[in-house]
Each structure stands twice: as structure tokens, then as C-alpha cells.
């Protein structure tokens, strides 16, 4: 053992890392989510981890803390990499991608993108510096049918339902409802109200009222009406009637209610309570122009959104002189997964993907053991051969420790049959490697 | 269309990005490689993209150019992230991982890791700043059976054989053969010779001879013997006899030849020429101590290694006071893939994963179309519904452009049958969504 200095490795705050059993569950989740996206025909896209800073900052000053890259051994006068930063979401890279590869794409372009993103935030509960997002977006030239505003929540519903996670609700709203309602009230800066209402679940109604009156300049009647609108919730088109009862009218409001009603209508076959219209959902981002989405855990809404998205009129406008409206939604995989791990709700899958451990009877019988393993692999079983001749008990112990369900015994003497032991039941039976079915 | 300034997006040199058809092939490759690794029971591991710099630099000054991270909006006096860098390979993070999670692992620990790595090199042919590596390693406490030195090339052989790539050879050597041979010749600094011989394929025999004599201080007889050894190649144990004929003897040489012979012997069932002992293979890295691997394309060996690896005695020694020998090999996915793309040998798969496009006969029949699509998805077919009522020709054209093989026609009138059109054959037949099989 060398006497060199030991660097005791420790976790890096905000950069999650899983032991193999936990990782095997994460991998199952990733496969499941991808399959859900592909089932609806979405194409896989990956973009580099970096973008030039101009692209990352193209939506104006961003509140996301960007990590920039610097070469450790860069020459003092070398500034060639000075303008690269790690992407902080997958939406900006996707907009850049669509503009850059416009002529190679078929529209409406439906893409999914499952990648890590980075934010130089102060790590705290549910906030990571490196985390995986699972995004789907549909983008089209000039016009994007409202049908997609309903398809995306349906996909998310199917995907999340297949994961073993606590109950959640996908809340839907429409920016036009908010904007039209506020304009119908005579409010001149609806976006300021949207930003204030977006904080409702964090800071409460009284604090929002204060902002609306003191900062956005609303009358107390206007503020009261805005908060009344935000209280409307429901999983069917009765929410449309509830808004109408507030007595505000404006063409944008009418358009928004029509859209919201149509989306709810197309989703009416989903289990009640899974997708709910919630007129308090605003999404702070400026670029949403219609439908907005936000999902939260029912038992911990304060944890914040686990999925979010919406419709935008022209996300790639800063990269290409084409009108490219779209609608997208993002599943915050790491946010969901890490919470369940830390709460002990995910305790892990199998340590390894091995289905069968083939016992090595002796060094002389290694090639026979390897041949059985090859045969089982050929037939679709993930198979290991124990790595050295050792007591059978020790070999079985290895399978137990690694969560391997079956131990295979090739003949220890010529002419004897193969046997296989099911470690869960303890049962051991004769078996033929050419026909055994697990 | 807004009049805002347009940021024309351009590729970032050294950061590959693929259009959807190319990406679909890459995804197939990634799935195939992963399946190959899992078939042999390797556990999935992912580590964060970053390590603290102390860890990245723990093997001493590295020739790999490291990218460090800096927060764009960092306060002048905030140095909390100053010590983070993107990993430049997956070996150092794996060594750190094993040390950090030692008590949660089962040994021998077999892990695969498929992730992006970053190097701040000057981009050139076959050299990227961001690329994907596919690594497998087996690591054990105190002792690692030689059997694994043969298992890894077998896995790589199976995996690469399943990809449609030009002919390649996986070359094997053993550091002990080189070291023992050099010591048997009376050379005092075998590592200097190993580093020189490692350049043989790049700079040629004469240049290596010059280095050996002028810089490593060898006599011309010693240099000649070293170069003679490097010429020995063969896919079976006859290479062992060929070395013996050179008349050098040393216990380390004998041990190395025994190991090399045993590994070749265990691999003797593989197709001739796929795994070859090549005594010129040295691998420059200091930490290899036995078997070394390096695969190259037969028609373009100058492109450099497409897989590489070897056996190491104590890779995690700087992180933990345990002896953890291992053996590993890495497939340079991006190096292989990007070369074939740039040479036009990979022209792309399907634009999207959709198997069936369901035609939308009219807005009134949307829910019937959605129901057929749901039924087909349930049965495992990736299915899209055309997004708006449009001329049938236009809907079929969309399927053609997106490489969707089947177009489904739900009844346009009540009581009529479903029909499905195979776009490859043009054949259109009646079909039942509950039993149709593609």
C-alpha cells in the first residue's frame, strides 16, 4: 500500500450521484420516459452541453446562473473559449437547434430531449447544480394547432402514471385568460400582474395583493378581482362558466377561455383530478403566450413544480427570421427522483442486471461454464460466470449480494445434468440451457 | 416577424451535434452497446460531469486539457466553485466513485459507464472537445483474476461486431512482456522505452530508434532488439514462441508471456484476426501494469485508437487505503461514429420513431382517430395522429417525409372498415386495430 497522500472523496453539493441500486431505478425511469415519448412519435435530439454565451443570453438578462468554461491550461492571451457556457435548460438549445437545422427538419417537428443541464445556483432542497430534464416540444412554421396543447399533458400523464411516485396534479391555465381578464379590468401592464400572481403559492394572497396595489398600481377592487380569478379551479369546462360569472369581458379573455375549454375537453377522458384547470398558474417566463402547465406533488405543493411548460409564439425568433410557434413541457426528472430517494421512497432496484450466475465448478471446467453462459446470453439472459474456482457457498453468496435471481450449476462431472437454483424460492431443479425459461 | 437582431447559429468546433436521422442511429448504437454490457452483468454507473480539481489532477500533471467551471454572475470574492472541472475521461471519476462508495459496492465490481467527457484540446480530425465514451471496468479488492482480461475483449468484440462499422482489430499486449524484455536486455528505465515504442505507429521505426538511443541511452543492439520485439504479431500463442526465439530471459517477461498466452487461449474461439497479440502496443499511460488493449480500423490505422484500455494495479490508491486492482476498456463512441458520419458511411435512420400515422379524416372524427392511436400504442406501435384536418395527400406526404412506414385510415363514414397503407409497398388493405401486426 503506497504512502501517497490520500484525497478523501466527498460528494459535491448540488451534483447528485447514485449508488448502483439507486442508479438502476433511475435508468428504468429514463427508459420508461423515453419510451413514453417515442410512443407518440417524438424524435430524439441531443445538443452539446455548451452554447455560445450570446445564445444563452439571447432572451435578455437571465436569472439562471450560467456556468462558463475556461481551459485550465489556457494561455493568458487565449480567449477562444471565453464565450462558452453550459446550458441551463433545454429550451434555448432547442430553439437554436431548430433555427440552425431548419432545412433538415420536418414540421410540425416533435422532439424529445433528455439531458443534463447546469445552474450555478446555491444548492438547496430540490435545487441542483447539475440535473436531468426530460423535455418534449412541438414546433411548427407559422401556426401550431391547439391539439398539441392537449397532447403534451396526455403524454406527461401517461409517463408519470407509469412511475411509482406520490400523487401529483398537472395544472393548466392559459395566459390569454389572465391577460384578457386583466385588460378587461382596465389594467395597463398585465405582465406585471402575471409575475405577481405567479408568486401566489409561495408568498400567499395578502403579499400578492400588496405587490399588485403598491408596485403594479392596481386599485384594491382590481387586485381583489385578480385574486378571485386565481381561486378558480376545476377539472372540466365548468371553470369557464366560473370565470364568466366574474363579469369581466375582453376578446383576449374569450379567446383564452375557448382554448382552455377545448384543451380540457380533449383531456376529459383522463382520470378526474389528474389534469386540472387552475387559474392561479401563471409561469413567470415572458415567452409563454397561451396554455401554461405546472405539475406539483399533492402532498407537498411547496416543493415546487415537477413539470412545467407552455405555448410560445416565437421562441426561435432571435435565431431565424421565421415565425416558429410551439408548445413544450419539461419533466424535472432529478427534482422528482432525488426527493423520493432522500425521503426513502426509492430504496433501489437490483445491484446489477445479471439474471443468471453460472457457477465455476473448477478451473478445468471453465470453458464448459463459459459455453453455458454464452448460450444463455444468446437466449436473452444477462449472464455472469463466477470469476474463479471457489467454494460453491461463496459463489452463491456473491449472487445473493448482487441480487442475481438465479444460480446455474453446469455439470460437475461428465454426463450429469445442468441444474438451476432460484434464490428467491430456494428451489433447485434440473434444466436445459437450450430451453430453460427463467 | 420581429425586427430584433438575429444571432445566426453556427456549429461550435469540437462539439458534435446531429440531425434527427443521424441521431436515431447514434441512439441505436448506444442501446446496442449498453445491452452488450448488461448481457455480461455490468452495473450502470453515472458520475457528475464535474470533479473537484484535486481529483482530476490526482494522477499528477495531466496532458489532458481540463475545462474548469466559473459562474458567470459570480461575486468577485466568491471562490466556492473555483475548484470544479469537467471530467476528461471516465476512469478517474470511476476510481473516485469506488473509493467514495466502497462500502456500498459488491466486489469484484463490474460497472459500465456511458457518458460525455470534455477536453479543451484544439479540435482536429477525430479529436473532439465533447465526446461520448463507453467504458467497462472490473475492479476488485487485492487481486483481480486474469479471466477478466479475456472477458473484456470478448465483450468489445461482440459489441463492435453488432455495429455496422469498417473492419477493425483489437490488439493486445502485456506490459510485463515489454518491461521484462527490456530489463532482460539490461535496460534500466523500461518506462522510457515503453513511451518511445508507444509512438511507433505515429513516427515510425527510425524515429523511435533515434529516441531510444539518443534520449533513453540504449545501445544500438538494445534498440534493435526492442524494435524486433515490436514487430511480433499473431492471433494465437505462437507469438509466445516468437518472443522466446529472441533469446531474452527475465522472470517478468516469463510472467507476462504466461498471462498473454492465457488470455489469447481463452479468446481462441473468436474469429481469426479480430483479436491479435501485437507486441508494439504499449499504451503511454503510466498506470497500466499488465494486459493492454488498443483497437484501430484496419483501413485507417493512422486515425488512432477507437478502443483502449488495460490492467492497472491500484487505480484508486490516491483516494483510499485499499489495494484495488482492475482491468478496463473504453469504446470511443464519438470518435468512431463521427468518422463514419463525415465519410458518408452513416447516412441516417428514420427521422422519427413513429410506426403508424393515423389520418385525421375531419375535425368531427378526431376522437375516433385518437382512440385508434391509443389502441395501437397500447399494442406497442409508436403512433401519431395527423395534427389537423387536411387533404389526405398532404397527410400521407407528412408520413413520407418523416419516414413513417404505415398510414392508418380510420373509417371516414360510420360502419366502414379501417384500412392501412404500407408506404414501402404502396399496398393498402383493410385492418383491425385490435389485431393488425404491422
UniProtKB/Swiss-Prot annotation, chains A, B:
<keyword id="KW-0030">Aminoacyl-tRNA synthetase</keyword>
<dbReference type="InterPro" id="IPR004154">
    <property type="entry name" value="Anticodon-bd"/>
</dbReference>
<dbReference type="GO" id="GO:0006427">
    <property type="term" value="P:histidyl-tRNA aminoacylation"/>
</dbReference>
<dbReference type="Pfam" id="PF13393">
    <property type="entry name" value="tRNA-synt_His"/>
</dbReference>
<dbReference type="InterPro" id="IPR041715">
    <property type="entry name" value="HisRS-like_core"/>
</dbReference>
<keyword id="KW-0963">Cytoplasm</keyword>
<dbReference type="InterPro" id="IPR004516">
    <property type="entry name" value="HisRS/HisZ"/>
</dbReference>
<keyword id="KW-0436">Ligase</keyword>
<comment type="subunit">
    <text>Homodimer.</text>
</comment>
<comment type="similarity">
    <text>Belongs to the class-II aminoacyl-tRNA synthetase family.</text>
</comment>
<dbReference type="Pfam" id="PF03129">
    <property type="entry name" value="HGTP_anticodon"/>
</dbReference>
<keyword id="KW-0067">ATP-binding</keyword>
<dbReference type="InterPro" id="IPR036621">
    <property type="entry name" value="Anticodon-bd_dom_sf"/>
</dbReference>
<dbReference type="GO" id="GO:0004821">
    <property type="term" value="F:histidine-tRNA ligase activity"/>
</dbReference>
<dbReference type="InterPro" id="IPR015807">
    <property type="entry name" value="His-tRNA-ligase"/>
</dbReference>
<dbReference type="GO" id="GO:0005524">
    <property type="term" value="F:ATP binding"/>
</dbReference>
<dbReference type="InterPro" id="IPR045864">
    <property type="entry name" value="aa-tRNA-synth_II/BPL/LPL"/>
</dbReference>
<keyword id="KW-0547">Nucleotide-binding</keyword>
<dbReference type="InterPro" id="IPR006195">
    <property type="entry name" value="aa-tRNA-synth_II"/>
</dbReference>
<dbReference type="GO" id="GO:0005737">
    <property type="term" value="C:cytoplasm"/>
</dbReference>
<keyword id="KW-0648">Protein biosynthesis</keyword>
<protein>
    <recommendedName>
        <fullName>Histidine--tRNA ligase</fullName>
        <ecNumber>6.1.1.21</ecNumber>
    </recommendedName>
</protein>
